[in-house]
Amino acid sequence: KHSLPDLPYDYGALEPHINAQIMQLHHSKHHAAYVNNLNVTEEKYQEALAKGDVTAQIALQPALKFNGGGHINHSIFWTNLSPNGGGEPKGELLEAIKRDFGSFDKFKEKLTAASVGVQGSGWGWLGFNKERGHLQIAACPNQDPLQGTTGLIPLLGIDVWEHAYYLQYKNVRPDYLKAIWNVINWENVTERYMACKK
């Protein structure tokens, strides 16, 4: 059974950039729903497997992708944020960003543009392409998980579903993007980068 991970900080810890009301709803309602629905879907999937019911297995794929992706994505997202975040990464990650995007500012512009440009709901990502040994920016619709759909290893995810910002930023997604850079946990992103380089 999957369970809702605890946040590594209080709901109000990311204010003024992301308010407590958003964080509480986002974590305790939205993420919790993905976890619950994933558990239900996996149970049904196990039953379908046991019966050899391929039609039922196929019918469950969208729910598995949506709720499984929602759980994976949010579990990364919470750790990608920190009340002590912001600024720039250091060391090897910063060097890789400069190598692959030209500069940290250019990287920020590109990931911001990819995230703002998502039509409807989805995510902007910084991922690691293991085959090429390079960082890449990608956008995924809905809750499609980055690694499961592109093969990139997720390092930093930016949730651009309206539930992530609407109560505070209304329909102005670029303002939310501008704010979120102040709470990016570069230590966590760096740990993820170093782990996938091994």
Swiss-Prot record:
Enzyme class: oxidoreductase
Modification N6-succinyllysine, positions: 44, 51, 98, 106
Sites bearing 3'-nitrotyrosine, chain numbering: 34
Gene3D superfamilies: Fe,Mn superoxide dismutase (SOD) domain (1.10.287.990), Iron/manganese superoxide dismutase, C-terminal domain (3.55.40.20)
Keyword Magnesium on entry: no
Keyword Mitochondrion listed: yes
Assembly, per entry: Homotetramer.
Name of the protein: Superoxide dismutase [Mn], mitochondrial
Organism: Pan troglodytes
